[in-house]
A protein has these predicted regions:
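Hydrophobic faces of well-ordered beta-strands that scaffold small-molecule active sites
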Residues: 1-3, 22-24, 53-56, 76-78
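Conserved active-site-proximal phosphate/metal-binding subdomains
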Residues: 16, 38-54, 60-196
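Glycine/Thr-rich beta-alpha phosphate-binding loop at enzyme active sites
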Residues: 4-43, 85, 89-91
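Conserved short-loop catalytic and cofactor-binding motifs
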Residues: 2, 29-33, 56, 82, ...
């Protein structure tokens, strides 16, 4: 069992609870997100944890995968680029918004679930909301499930990470994986050449 965590404190609680591994959700991740730098988050966790550790957050290229490993993570956890694959069970407009988007098209808000999450601004606007005026109801309990409002947070308002600029078109999953692999190997060779 791997558990998503956004802080060192949550990581410790998860390990105390018996998880087998951790997914460090750092700044830039799609959907529910952390606000800590991946360098700081992985470093803090690696001071005491030597078990399986994935890094998530703004990972969309092979270079990003190499960087995740360089921080001390065992592997990278990638989400948003896979939404824009042919096999993904996402509506065409969601996929198109990712392909056409970049980091500037992402908003971080706790207004929908009480927990900070990254969403595509365009999907917030399509739901009839003003992204600049979103506010969390402090009296409302935190709820990460779909809402009973006129829109469903995860169905109509689309989670997405900041690394989407790397997503240029809708491709089969195998093609995305092959691209990530090629980019990783090229980045690894370049890095090894630099350090001699």
């Amino acid at each position: 069992v791997l558990n998503d965590i956004i802080s060192n404190r949550q990581a410790k609680k998860s390990v105390e609870g018996g998880v087998d591994g951790l997914i460090a959700v750092a700044a830039g991740a799609g959907g529910h997100t952390g606000n800590t730098s991946p360098f700081a988050l992985v470093s803090e966790i690696r001071e005491w944890w030597d078990g399986p550790l994935a890094l998530s957050g703004c990972i969309a290229t092979g270079q990003n995968i190499l960087a995740a490993l360089a921080t001390g993570a065992d592997f990278a956890y990638i989400g948003s680029p896979f939404i824009a694959t042919k096999e993904a069970n996402a509506v065409a407009d969601y996929k198109a918004m990712i392909v056409d988007g970049s980091a500037k098209d992402i908003i971080t808000t706790d207004a929908f679930s009480g927990v900070p999450a990254n969403f595509l601004v365009g999907s917030v606007e399509r739901a009839g909301l003003d992204p600049k005026s979103l506010k969390r109801d402090a009296d409302k309990a935190i709820d990460v499930s779909e809402t009973s409002q006129s829109f469903n947070t995860w169905k109509d308002i689309w989670g997405c990470g900041q690394g989407i600029n790397a997503v240029k078109n809708i491709v089969p999953t195998a093609e995305l994986v092959a691209r990530l692999s090629r980019e990783y190997e090229a980045a690894r060779r370049t890095f090894l050449d630099r350090i001699g």
